Amino acid sequence: MIKTLLSFVFSGIIAISFSAHSKTKVTWSMESNADRDPIFLEKLQNAYNSAQNNYELEIQFEPNETRIESLRTSMLAGMGPDIVETPGPSYVKEYQEAGMLENLDSYAAEFGWKDKLIPWAYSSGVFDGSLYAIPKTHESMVMLYNKTLFEENGWKVPTTLEELEDVAGKIQAKGMDVYTYGSSGWQPTHEHLVGIYLNNYAGPQAVYEAIIGEREWTDPVFVEALELLKKHMDDEGLWYGSLENYYAIGWDDFHAQFATRGAAMMTIGTWTFQATSLGIGASGDEWGWAPLPSLSSQSDGPNFMIAIGTTMSINAAAKNKDGAIDVLNWIMSNKDVVIDIASDFEFGEFVVPLLLDESDIPSSISPQVTSYLNEYARITGDGNYGYCTWTFWPAEPGVHIWKDMEVVWAGDISVEDFMHDHQKMWDKARKKNETLPVPLRD
C-alpha cells in the first residue's frame, strides 16, 4: 500500500514538474534562404525560446515559390501558422479582407507599438482603421557604383539626368556597361525600374497624388517617365548593354558583373548590401552608394523610395494567439536583438522599422551602410520620400506594372495605352476598396 502510494505521489510530482516547465508551441512560416536560415534559428528562434519559459517558437522555412501558395491554402482552410509572414501589404490586404488576420489594435495600445516604430511603417499595416501587420523589414532603392573605378577615371557620381547621360557615355567608351541588373529568375524586377522612373522623373508628390486618386496615371508626366525608361532600356542599353541581356541575367550574374568591373553602377534595393560587400570586396575595389539621380526638374531633388519587404501578422485562427503576440512584442521590445540580426545582413534583411538613433548602429557595419542609414533617416525624416510599387500598389495594378511592362518594351503597346489600362485597374481597385495604406505628406 505504501509502495503504491509513493508511486502515485512520485508520478504526480513528475506530472506537475513537466506541466510547470512545458512550453506551448508558436509556429511561424518564414521564407527559406540558405544563408539566412541559420541566423534566424540561432538569434531569433533560439534566443526567444531561451528568454522566457512560456512559449516555444518554431520557425518553419519554405521557399517562397511554394510557401505563398501553401500558406494561402492552409489559411483558407482555417489552419496555417500562428505568425503569418507575407511578402508585403497587398497580401496582408487580401487576408485582412477575408477575416483571416487578428486585429492588433488592443495589443498595440497595451504594449505601445506605435511609439516604437517609424510612423510611415506603422501606418503601412493599418487597414480600415485598424492594425493588422507589423513590418519585418523595410527597404529602399539606391544606386551603387564602383568607387575605385570612378576615382581612377575622374568620373562624377550622377545626381541629374544630364550627369547620368554624360557619365554613361564615358563608361560605354571604356567598353563597360553603365548599369548591371537583370530579371532572370524574378520577373517583378521590372517594377524596381518602373518605380525609380516614376518617382525620380514625375516626383514623389505626383506619385502620391495618383495613389490617393487626385491625379490620373495617364498624366503626361508619368507617360514621359516611362518613355524615358523605355529609351534607356531599349534604345541606349543602359542596363547590361541591351534589353535582351537584361532579361537573361539574374542575381548571381549581375553581382558578379558589378564585382568584376563589367559594369560601373547598379540600381538595386538595399537588400543587396551584404551580397555587394562580399562580392566587390573580394576584388579589391571599393563600392559606394548614392541616392538615385533626379531625372527631371519636376522630381524636386533626391528622395528615398520607401517600401516594406515582408510583414508579420497573427492568424485569426491561430492555435496560440497569446504566444504569437508575445513573440512580436519581444521583437519590438528588444532593439539589440533586431540590430544584431540586421547587422549580420548589413542591414539588408530583418530591418524592423524601430526608431533608432545614430548611436544604435554598430561600429562593425561598413561605412557605406552606416552612411546610408544616417542619410535615409535624415531625408525620410524630413518627409522627402517616394513610393515603391510593391508596398503601395493594389494587387491587380501592382502585377500589371511589371508583368505587362515587357509588352511596352517590346513596342507592342504604347506607353499611353499602357497607362490608360493602368488607370482603369486603379479605378477598379478604388471602387472595390482594395487600395493600400499610404502615409500622408506634409
Segments from the language model and where they lie:
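Hinge/lid segment of periplasmic solute-binding proteins
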Residues: 87-142, 156, 165, 171, ...
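Extracytoplasmic/periplasmic solute-binding protein
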Residues: 128, 132-136, 141, 165-218
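Extracytoplasmic/periplasmic substrate-recognition and gating elements
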Residues: 46, 50, 77, 153, ...
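Glycine-centered hinge/linker elements that transmit conformational signals in sensory
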Residues: 168-170, 212-246, 292-295
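C-terminal capping/gating helix-and-loop segments adjacent to ligand/active sites or protein-protein/ligand interfaces
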Residues: 126, 211, 368-427
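Short, solvent-exposed loop/beta-turn-alpha elements that line the ligand-binding surface or hinge
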Residues: 103-117, 200-224, 278-282, 294-303, ...
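Extracytoplasmic "Venus flytrap"/periplasmic binding protein-like
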Residues: 43, 47-120, 126, 148-159, ...
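A structural signal for short loop-to-beta-strand junctions that line the ligand-binding cleft
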Residues: 81-82, 113-149, 177-183, 192, ...
